[in-house]
Amino acid sequence: MASVLEIPFYDADDFHLQANIEKMKQGISLQDVDRESWLDTLTNNLAKWETAAGAVLACSALKETYRTVLQSGVENDVTWVYLYGRSKLIKERMAGRKGHYFKPDLVDSQFADLEPPQYGWHFNISSSSDYIVKSILDKLRHTD
């Protein structure tokens, strides 16, 4: 998506504190308090990216409160794209991420915390990535 739009891509996982990464490596779920500094960092970066050309941020943003914090850092509305899928498929994809610290076993705890957004564009990840990217681009063109 980012390469097609010619803007930077960021993975929110890259902004976690080392202590949180260690917890996840051990299979320990993060709590809201663990995510506070991570959300602050992402919010500050969103403001910087907004003043540049924009960016694509891949971020779990599991709860509405997290999304509210992230939106608060920018002047314009965030274009929210919610990618959803079955736990089994997500675990399979997580297991295929070589060298990533997040254990597929933690997916269940994320599903337990998940508050799906009632807004934005929703896509099932069982669709091809090409289809999802094309659909998002079509929606972006019709939003301007």
Residue ranges and their predicted role:
Residues H16, A61-K63, G85-L89:
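Conserved nucleotide-binding/hydrolysis micro-motifs of P-loop NTPases
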